[in-house]
């Protein structure tokens, strides 16, 4: 029986990748999902300096919308000037071209109609593609930022920085990461609620075509673990979906390598009762409140 982990790509597009992960455990599949969601670095607007804002949009709402605009994060892990450093690792005081990208937005409505401001109207100071707003196609204007009426104006400067979604969701390269296992429910991990017929009232997913259906009355093992997972990753556009998975696997490997190294270097020491100064008949009050008195250990 093959014990090596395999990845079979079923479908890949500009914004999503659908694949099958086999010969692995539920823990590994979920770890990969969590890494892809929160550990892959991207660039996003982190600071907004508003000079003028006479629109109906409050400053904090405007800053929040700007922060959630997906920005091109290709090659962000490369050394500057191709990529970016984390601000916390940079030698500068606050931000600099090595750890940030500047974007500007200046707009004023002079006509009688409504002027719509989109992500495409953001001007990036750098010559590289890093930090540019993601557009679905050349004709697209990107997400709507705000609307201006006559004589209303906004003028601001944005500082985009490198980060991960563990710090804030705006740095997440994905909009959704999901996986399914055992589409026929052979392991009986799911109890279906139904009125008459469970098969008729619970349609099978497309993943059921990749497995043999169970025979009627087929026995099952409660302790059996799933070994095949159907994963679907949807990108926000800042990083291609195939690159998201490559980076996710690399980051997961690095985390496991650090864990193994630390376990090898530091062996846990077992302390005796004497070393802990714990006497067998020591009087301890384990009540968390001590009748209103201060705890003393």
UniProtKB/Swiss-Prot annotation:
GO terms for biological process: transcription by RNA polymerase II. Residues 270-297 are annotated as: Disordered. It is found in: Nucleus. It holds the Pfam family RNA_pol_A_bac. GO terms for cellular component: chromatin; cytosol; nucleus; RNA polymerase II, core complex; RNA polymerase II, holoenzyme. Keywords: DNA-directed RNA polymerase, Nucleus, Transcription. PROSITE patterns: RNA_POL_D_30KD. InterPro entries: DNA-dir_RNA_pol_30-40kDasu_CS, DNA-dir_RNA_pol_insert, DNA-dir_RNA_pol_RpoA/D/Rpb3, RBP11-like, RNAP_Rpo3/Rpb3/RPAC1, RNApol_insert_sf, Rpo3/RPB3_RNA_Pol_subunit. Residues 287-297 have a biased composition (Polar residues). CDD domains: RNAP_II_RPB3. Its main location: nucleus. One of its GO terms (molecular function) is DNA binding. Belongs to the archaeal Rpo3/eukaryotic RPB3 RNA polymerase subunit family. DNA-dependent RNA polymerase catalyzes the transcription of DNA into RNA using the four ribonucleoside triphosphates as substrates. Component of RNA polymerase II which synthesizes mRNA precursors and many functional non-coding RNAs. Pol II is the central component of the basal RNA polymerase II transcription machinery. It is composed of mobile elements that move relative to each other. RPB3 is part of the core element with the central large cleft and the clamp element that moves to open and close the cleft. PANTHER family: DNA-DIRECTED RNA POLYMERASE (PTHR11800), DNA-DIRECTED RNA POLYMERASE II SUBUNIT RPB3 (PTHR11800:SF2). Component of the RNA polymerase II (Pol II) complex consisting of 12 subunits. This is DNA-directed RNA polymerase II subunit RPB3. It comes from Schizosaccharomyces pombe (strain 972 / ATCC 24843).
